[in-house]
Amino acid sequence: MNKLLMALALGAAGTAWAQMTPVGVWHSIDDKTGETKAEIRLTEADGAVRGRIEKLLRKGADQAARCIDCEGDRKDQPVLGLEIIRGARKVAGKDVWEGGKILDPENGRDYTLRLTPVEGGRKLEVRGSIAFIGRTQTWVRVQ
């Protein structure tokens, strides 16, 4: 009985910890319209978070759209499958990931990135900024 309780407690603790990470699948929500825009998968490798667009969810979205305004290796790449988050790393002692970039495929611009899981990891505050000017979207966890 004690072993069962211990296993359940450890499993619950692991689940709670795992949710306070940006890693997972998220619905990006337009901060201006409240509309669900896309499904984004965030992964972590070598301590850095990356994110790709897995599904375009906006009504009437062009599933064959390309990032014509992007630069470098993302120039003219399909938006579906496009890596829009690169290089965010966890800040020591905090549930915050910074130091990376987020791409807005609608204008091809990269912004300084901050990711902050909130509400027990059910939501993710995604802040993109240039200098002191920026905006925050709240994404909703899918899985």
Please provide the spans of the model-predicted regions.
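Sec/Tat signal peptide C-region and signal peptidase I cleavage site
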Residues: G14-A18
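Short, hydrophobic/aromatic-rich segments at coil-to-beta transitions
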Residues: Q19-V25, G93-G100, R122-E125
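Edge beta-strand at a domain terminus
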Residues: G121, I130-Q143
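Beta-strand residues in well-ordered beta-sheet regions across diverse protein folds
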Residues: R52, E125-R127
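Structural motif
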Residues: A45, V118-G120
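Central antiparallel beta-sheet cores of small beta-barrel/beta-sandwich binding domains
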Residues: S28-L113
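Sec-dependent N-terminal signal peptides
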Residues: L4-A13
